[in-house]
A protein has these predicted regions:
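N-terminal secretory signal peptides
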Residues: 1-22
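Acidic (Asp/Glu)-rich catalytic clusters
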Residues: 47, 71-76, 91-101, 113-132, ...
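Acidic-and-aromatic substrate-binding clefts and catalytic sites of carbohydrate-active enzymes
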Residues: 59-66, 86-94, 109-116, 138-146, ...
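Hydrophobic faces of well-ordered beta-strands that scaffold small-molecule active sites
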Residues: 50-55, 82-84, 132-137, 161-163, ...
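N-terminal export signals
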Residues: 22-42
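Acidic/histidine-rich catalytic cores of soluble enzymes
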Residues: 191-289, 293
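C-terminal segment of N-terminal export signals and the immediately downstream linker at the start
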Residues: 10, 16, 38-73
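Active-site acidic/histidine proton-transfer and metal-coordination neighborhood
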Residues: 27-29, 33, 128-229, 322
Length: 335
């Protein structure tokens, strides 16, 4: 307030002075409220993540029992994107048989489009405002049925297709990893012709030196950066003895997708992380995003800085999806 206002107040009757004081108090309160609102709005707009996705293997039993109810829950939580897991109607017979062999141990059998055709599944996702952006697909299917993969992917609006892991028999030696790098280049080219990007999700093996070479880096260095991309799982990367941030910085624009989860305490594979038994051993140490020891905010910052486009929460077969997945999303919305 300027001098003119002060001089006027000094000669006003008491009632007018009181009104003036009320005005000042009200104006201060209103201004403070607007400032607070502005700060909150800026905070909301400056959050590191806006469209957070979910890998559906986080709640496979729920999806198996009630697909529509599960998708509605996911949507109401605030998730926007999805990553699917197979097999699918277009999957190869080999992929389907391998899945059928393990479903008794898993306790569920639903996958892919959950008995819907691709068109109806897309309509169901649209109904709940969800977009499928990525899909894990069996290696054999990608090698033998890429045109069918491409047709389904275009119907769904997928951008990325890739494998969840390299079959164990194909990665026993460095030569095996080199052959996989060559195979990935071929798959990347096939995917590109279908308007897609091929991604490789590493499950934590191949992150330690073998004969003076790190297999994961061998694959990164021997694949075409225009054709082959990667999906980092920050839990399995850490369990394999590697630093997620170091890989993101060292290989900018190679990682298109990332799985976000947390680790209740720092743990590593009992051996080399090469088989499902070693993965299962570490599941008890998986926790909600933000509830563990991983530097989630810094990882997300470096991921965005270095080209990651899709961020998927994944909490493998978590016991209480409604609580766990909501907690992870709430944390990520506020970093």
């Amino acid at each position: 307030f300027g001098d003119y206002t002060v001089s006027c107040i000094l000669v006003q009757p008491v009632s007018i002075i009181m009104k003036r004081r009320t005005f000042i108090k009200t104006n201060f309160t209103l201004t403070s409220g607007l400032l607070l609102f502005g700060q909150q709005a800026c905070k909301s707009n400056n959050n590191l993540l806006q469209d957070i996705g979910l890998q559906l293997f986080s709640l496979p039993k729920m999806l198996n029992n009630d697909l529509r109810g599960s998708l509605e829950m996911i949507s109401k939580m605030g998730y926007k994107k999805l990553e699917l897991y197979g097999p699918y109607p277009f999957s190869s017979e080999k992929a389907i048989k391998e899945w059928e062999a393990i479903t008794p141990q898993l306790g569920f059998s639903g996958s892919g489009f959950f008995n819907y055709n691709v068109s109806d599944f897309r309509s169901l996702l649209d109904e709940y405002g969800l977009k499928a952006k990525s899909a894990h697909i069996h290696l054999h299917t990608l090698n033998t049925r890429m045109p069918e993969v491409g047709h389904a992917a275009r119907s769904l609006g997928l951008e990325c297709v890739g494998i969840a892991f390299i079959p164990e028999e194909k990665r026993k030696t460095l030569d095996g990893y080199k052959r996989m790098a060559d195979e990935f280049n071929v798959l990347g080219d096939l995917a590109k012709k279908e308007g897609l990007k091929f991604i490789y999700h590493n499950h934590g093996y191949g992150l330690k030196e073998q004969d003076d070479q790190v297999p994961m880096k061998l694959i990164l260095d021997n694949t075409d950066p225009e054709l082959v991309f990667f999906e980092m799982d920050i839990f399995w990367t850490t369990a394999g003895g590697a630093d997620p941030i170091e890989y993101l910085k060292s290989y900018p624009n190679r990682y298109l997708c990332i799985h976000l989860k947390d680790m209740s305490k720092l743990v590593y594979f009992s051996k080399d992380g090469s088989n499902p038994q070693q993965w299962i051993e570490l599941l008890p140490y998986m926790t909600n995003v933000g509830n563990g020891i991983l530097d989630i905010k810094q990882i997300v910052y470096e991921a965005k800085k270095n080209g990651v486009q899709h961020f998927f929460v994944e909490h493998d077969m978590v016991e209480n999806p409604k609580i766990a997945l909501q907690a992870s999303l709430d944390f990520l919305k506020n970093i």
